[in-house]
């Protein structure tokens, strides 16, 4: 416990909060080959690996994920939401922040219905979250 005198000399310092999706906090200038401080809500990338992984206890499933090389040269693991997908290696995808609680190391989501990623077929509810067009009347 510090004394009042110690606190007068050196006040308490508040902790800076760390970003939960750090890859979205940097851009990349390919002309200068330097990172830039462009914070972005989404980033484009190329899938380098598509596969499944198993969640932490007590859950059990095969969750779909893609390893993505972003436009700022970061490589991240992103979750593919929804039932079924058309992604393969070299697919161009758009990612957003947002972790998957039962998959360690997965801090990003792939946006369905954007770039090479198709929307979920036959989805009727929450269509906007899964990139599905309105059904024909």
UniProtKB/Swiss-Prot annotation:
Residue positions where 3-methylthioaspartic acid is found in the record: 102
Start and end residues of each stretch annotated as Disordered: 1-23
The keyword tRNA-binding belongs to this UniProt entry's keyword annotation: yes
PROSITE patterns in alphabetical order: RIBOSOMAL_S12
UniProt KW keywords: Methylation, Ribonucleoprotein, Ribosomal protein, RNA-binding, rRNA-binding, tRNA-binding
A GO MF term: rRNA binding
A Pfam family assignment: Ribosom_S12_S23
GO cellular component, one term: small ribosomal subunit
InterPro entries: NA-bd_OB-fold, Ribosomal_uS12, Ribosomal_uS12_bac
GO biological process per UniProt: translation
N-terminal signal peptide: none
Subunit structure comment from the entry: Part of the 30S ribosomal subunit. Contacts proteins S8 and S17. May interact with IF1 in the 30S initiation complex.
Protein role: With S4 and S5 plays an important role in translational accuracy.
Family: Belongs to the universal ribosomal protein uS12 family.
NCBIfam families tied to this protein: rpsL_bact
Protein name (database record): Small ribosomal subunit protein uS12
Species, as recorded: Leuconostoc citreum (strain KM20)
Gene: rpsL
